[in-house]
From Swiss-Prot:
GO cellular component terms attached to this protein's record: fungal-type vacuole membrane
UniProt topology in membrane: Multi-pass membrane protein
PANTHER family noted in UniProt: AUTOPHAGY-RELATED PROTEIN 22
Residue ranges of the TM segments: 41-61, 103-123, 139-159, 163-183, 228-248, 257-277, 332-352, 366-386, 402-422, 431-451, 470-490, 499-519
Keywords: Amino-acid transport, Autophagy, Glycoprotein, Membrane, Transmembrane, Transmembrane helix, Transport, Vacuole
Function field: Vacuolar effluxer which mediate the efflux of amino acids resulting from autophagic degradation. The release of autophagic amino acids allows the maintenance of protein synthesis and viability during nitrogen starvation.
Glycosylation sites: N308
Top-level taxon of the source organism: Eukaryota
Primary location: membrane
Annotated InterPro entries: Atg22, Atg22-like, ATG22/LtaA_families, MFS_trans_sf
Name of the molecule in the record: Autophagy-related protein 22
GO biological process, any: amino acid transmembrane export from vacuole
Amino acid sequence: MAYESLASEPNDGVTDHNDDALYVGIDTLKAARDNIKGWYLYSFSSEPFVVSAVATYVPLLLEQFARINGVQLDDHNAPCSTSSSDKCVLGLFNNRVFVDSSSFALYVFSLSVLFQTVVVISVSGMVDRWKTISFRKNVLVTFGMVGAFATVLISLLNETQYYSLVVYYIVANSCYGVINVVGNSLLPLFVDDLVRLQPDHTVPAAEELSLDTDDKDGLTTVISGRGASIGYSAALVVQLMSILLVRLSPSKQDIQYAVFFVGLWWAVWQFPMYWLLSDSIIPDQQSNQAIANGRYYDIDGSIFTFVNLSSLKYGWKLLGEALKHATLLRDVVIFLIGWFILSDSLTTINSTAIIFAKTELHMSTINLISLSIITMISAMVGAFAIPQIVSTSLHVPPQRTILLIICWASIIPLYGMLGFIFQSFGLKHQFEMFILGVWYGISMGSVAAVSRSLFTIIIPKGRESTFFSLFSITDKGSSIVGPFIIGIVTDKTHNIRYSFFILFILLVFSLPIFKMLNVERGKREAEEISKLHVNIDPIQD
């Protein structure tokens, strides 16, 4: 096994055409363009899992399995009725612990995110040490196939296998977390290769939008935006197909048919992605240019070659380095604390609302999938319209924009709380759920767009990867806390409506934290820290 590396990072997107050692008889430009297409397929194949399965299908299945295997709250000797109006609890660990059927789904979601976070940090270190496209491709496909297989297995379970449902869901969600991080890490490499291999600086994606290929940030944004659009389009297709499959099921409510389709979709699109992704630049093993710069080349790209304790520990070393850098920047710390609370609140609203709609409003499976589609479309509109209207047209700075979005989002739990006072409104009817679905979608789409742009302003240039790893971990890891707290509240009250109080408090609590953010001070501190030459040797143990 030979490990080689490129001489240096690309110099302003200019290729040294005299460096023939970099080219080993392959159509490098075609390979670079194919990599972009393969990256689009990564989003196209996996996005339906998180949009459809994680957000809608699996929470419904968890609540359904818990209810079918549960007992009545008032009489643990009486089996739970399939009617959604009964209060049911599920006995766990040989009936040593009883949890509300709604809480069960929330606890499992929290547990899955915990496992996902640990796996992602560990695997990301391994990927950062061996940066070949071939190796990362194998990581993508391996975890993609395992995740897809686990998703298909969920669809084959019978209703008594609730422990198996938990295990398969944790495996699938952890696999998605890995491919999400690895997929995002590939984009900068693809853009670098595309720019340096294009001799006349006419990259098609840049031409169409009047971007110079020297503007790597602009080109990256264009390709990233297209990938996100392709992913959402795939999720929309899967959701529409899921409605048809559920309608064709014997009970016309069997959501496992939809889960099977999600797993099948995820698996099938791995094959063209595998064929498209490859190393567009591979150094000659005899070349004097094979000098370490961090891009290590394993020609075989086997994932199993690098699974060792040293590689797994490296991810945690990188996390420690990122935390050390973050503590030097006051406004980055303020942002991450606020983002932890805000992201947790918004994510928990989704998982809570889907269970609330099923158990309290008795919405059918078809209506719940339709609600998910409406929310997704609204998120796409929010991601595009809010930054354009509020930030560009009205010239509202990002910090104030995110405060407005928090106020907008807090209306959702506040409206749910009104149900304790009024009998005619306050999430008492199904149509109200569709209205709030639009409201929530706009919140999610806009906050995703604005938060990233705001964070970009206050982090040091040249260390974006380090700080965005913290952003990602904060974003994903925060989802451990909210569902767990809501699960406890629902267990104590056996009324999931009380969760709206917790969600409202969390959203309001994030307001003064973001208010403390000083963007100008953050920019100054970021410029100062960017002058420091702090780094980790990627091959040190």
